[in-house]
Amino acid sequence: MGCQEAFRTTLLEPFSLKKDEAAKVKSFKDSVSYIEEALGVYFTEVEKQWKLFNTEKSWSPVGLEDAKLPKEAYRFKLTWILKRIFKLRCLQVFLYYFLIVYTSGNVDLISRFLFPVVMFFIMTRDFQNMGMIVLSVKMEHKMQFLSTIINEQESGANGWDEIAKKMNRYLFEKKVWNNEEFFYDGLDCEWFFSCFFYRLLSLKKTMWFASLNVELWPYVKEAQSVVTSL
């Protein structure tokens, strides 16, 4: 665990979740004033990063007019999901052992039943789901996502589709994802924002599967205000 992550998990999140001054004093005692001073410095730096990131360092995709969402390439979302799970190398192994097990006369019924189940779980180890990505994504990538939502000009379903295209390109270029198919469509992108950003802000409760993104709360609120008009 890095220094910043330790600061976030031991001070920033626990302190920010306290409802009032009495609760803070009860938990942190005489350290409250020092923690508040440290958080003030930290939030000032975050604000500087956001302003710089959202203006001078603003990322703009090239050739996005030719980009397609996975929903345009796959007939069903299930096909897209299965492609992630059944990678070519995994599928070859699965078919090879499937052939051995089911053509052998010495294999009992239980083994034949358990084999596909075990192989499925082995293959799904490589499947990077949304929740795990949120845990590993850098703060700058989260800022880019929120900035993309805030600055989107399109409205309605088209707006979310455009955001999904831009983020698919961005996550691929930054090597966060191995292709431009992270988001299936605009609805997938909207769900991602709702689940891992706005919902956590509303609950203000620590979740095992994602960071609370306390530093980003002001920008999440701004993005949500834009979302209501999309």
Swiss-Prot record:
Keywords per UniProt? Membrane, Transmembrane, Transmembrane helix
The answer, when asked if Transmembrane is one of the entry's keywords, is yes
Keyword S-adenosyl-L-methionine tagged: no
Please list the disulfide bridges: none
Official protein name in the record: Putative uncharacterized protein YIR043C
**GO CC term, one of those recorded:** membrane
Where mainly located?
membrane
Q: Where in the cell is it found?
A: Membrane
